[in-house]
From Swiss-Prot:
Localisation: Mitochondrion
Domain of life: Eukaryota
Gene (UniProt): AEP1
Gene Ontology terms, MF aspect: translation regulator activity
Protein name: ATPase expression protein 1, mitochondrial
Length: 518
């Protein structure tokens, strides 16, 4: 029994401290963490912080947000399924790991705050403005060599011209490097000859073969600790090297060339930086390196350079982005396995601003198969609807959307509802006059669900002509529906025997319809 003012005050303070110590974000039930088939530890499996979720296009609608905030027990997004790609801290090693998380809360506390932060983060990504890398490269790559300067390089050019093979690469590199040093030794102190201009000139004019380009890359590496003492100089040289790589060879590149170039990049990092040099590279050089690493199949470096470009507010060329997506598909063999989809999300997480504001048809086609929940699909479709090329994008992707809708569940009524949602979302783009080719695809999809009411409604509303061939397609779809959804929803309005009989008699006139009679 609490009898004194001091005791009352003590218990009140304890209660206050306890309330203050509660985690703002709700915690899920404790679940075992398993790795390599062994239980490591039981830990509190939290709903990830919004900053930890790397999904580049999922945005909960107002209805989803309201439902989550109005549900007392276990409110969730994406039906609480384990499909939200996240980068979280491992509870034991504290290393960052990639997982599929469940956006499922214990109760309603803190859900509104979590949603506000998540939506704010998506809004921030939406507001990022990207501009293409400047096509005017004169500002950093112009060679400051006069005709008099070039005349001083004659002996060096002769050395390069006399090299017929690079079998003894080291001795050839030393010969060129020694002659380069002689030029500086002979030259007066008043000269404006710079090592970067000489090397860029040689690369531009004598780097037309893979062998000589490798030789000049090695000479460049040797000069890193003598005359190439600024990152600005390396921008000039890297630009010309990468131009030659692009012009000289088609992938796959020579392994020796790849090794030489990547050794040079590593040497640049060691010379100027303790880590990586992207911050000091010109955006065009970063874009060149991105293109190079995509072509060599180095996805990790490609992701690094792509993310760095976007963080700097640079929009990569559409062709480069498309090649990057193709490289991801090649690496994962267009897999739809859960683990591979999660890994794919890690490689495209940086693309959020591009998806939101600069999405292309190829990018949207890449993203549709990655959706594992209908709400993800709706988020993507909403982005397409708001894009500058909405109609053209929907024309190209709608058949893929329709097909994808039917993969989330086997329940014909849910599928029918989802098909109706997609149809209603795209109708305004066409001024309610959806092209008949798309309406016909919707009708066949409703037939696969055995939904006679929606089929009849769309045929009448859009005055679809039922050719003999199209009737046969409908019949095949209805037969598949009967096999796949046997005895399910047979009494529901729109699905029952009466509606089936009515539909067959009114809309089908080919002899094959007898096979469908109830």
């Amino acid at each position: 029994m609490i009898t004194t003012v001091q005791e009352i005050s003590k218990w009140r303070n304890l209660w206050f401290i306890r309330m203050q110590s509660r985690k703002w974000y709700p915690v899920l039930k404790k679940t075992p963490l398993v790795a390599d088939g062994r239980k490591i530890i039981k830990h509190a499996d939290k709903v990830p912080h919004p900053e930890e979720i790397i999904h580049p296009f999922y945005q909960p609608t107002a209805i989803e947000q309201f439902t989550a905030c109005a549900t007392e027990y276990n409110p969730s997004l994406l039906d609480g399924k384990k499909i939200a790609p996240s980068l979280i801290k491992h509870p034991v090693s504290l290393k960052t790991i990639l997982v599929d998380s469940k956006l499922k809360f214990d109760d309603i506390r803190g859900v509104n705050r979590w949603l506000m932060e998540f939506v704010a983060r998506r809004q921030h990504q939406r507001n990022i403005v990207l501009t293409p890398a400047s096509k005017s490269v004169r500002s950093f790559h112009v060679l400051h060599l006069s005709s008099t300067d070039i005349a001083k390089l004659r002996a060096l050019e002769n050395v390069l011209s006399e090299i017929e093979n690079t079998n003894d690469l080291q001795s050839r590199v030393e010969s060129v490097n020694n002659e380069l040093q002689n030029i500086f030794d002979r030259d007066s102190k008043q000269t404006r000859l710079f090592c970067e201009d000489i090397l860029a000139y040689l690369i531009k004019n004598y780097g037309n073969s893979t062998e000589k380009l490798i030789l000049l890359i090695n000479v460049t590496e040797m000069q890193l600790y003598s005359r190439l003492d600024q990152m600005k100089a390396m921008n000039i040289i890297l630009y010309h090297i990468l131009c030659k790589v692009e012009a000289n060879e088609n992938p796959p590149y020579s392994p020796t060339l790849v090794t030489a170039l990547e050794n040079l990049l590593a040497a640049i990092n060691n010379r100027f930086f303790p880590g990586r040099c992207e911050n000091s590279l010109h955006p065009i050089v970063i874009e060149q390196l991105l293109s190079y690493f995509i072509k060599t199949g180095n996805l990790n470096e490609s992701k690094n350079f792509l993310g760095h470009l976007i963080k700097k507010g640079i929009l990569p060329e559409a062709t480069i982005i498309n090649r990057y997506l193709e490289a991801i598909d090649v690496h994962f063999d267009k897999s739809t396995k859960i683990f591979d989809i999660r890994s794919k999300f890690a490689f495209i997480a940086d693309l959020a601003p591009i998806i939101e504001n600069y999405g292309t048809i190829d990018l949207f086609k890449f993203l549709i198969p990655m959706c594992r929940h209908f709400d993800e699909l709706c988020s993507l479709l909403n982005i397409i609807r708001k894009s500058n090329n909405a109609k053209r994008a929907v024309d190209s992707t709608l058949p893929i959307f329709i097909k994808k809708v039917l993969t989330f569940t086997k329940d014909p009524m849910i599928n029918s509802g989802n098909l109706s949602t997609v149809f209603n979302m795209v109708s305004p783009i066409y001024g309610q006059n959806v092209p008949s080719e798309f309406v016909e695809k919707f009708i066949l999809s409703f037939a696969l669900q055995g939904n006679y009411t929606m089929m009849a409604h769309m045929i009448d509303t859009y005055k679809i002509k039922l050719s003999h061939k199209y009737q046969l397609q409908i019949i095949r779809a209805l037969k598949n529906s009967e096999r796949n959804h046997a005895l399910k929803n047979t009494g529901a309005v729109g699905y029952n025997k009466e509606f089936k009989k009515y539909f067959i008699e009114k809309y089908l006139n080919c002899t094959e319809r007898e096979a469908l009679r109830p």
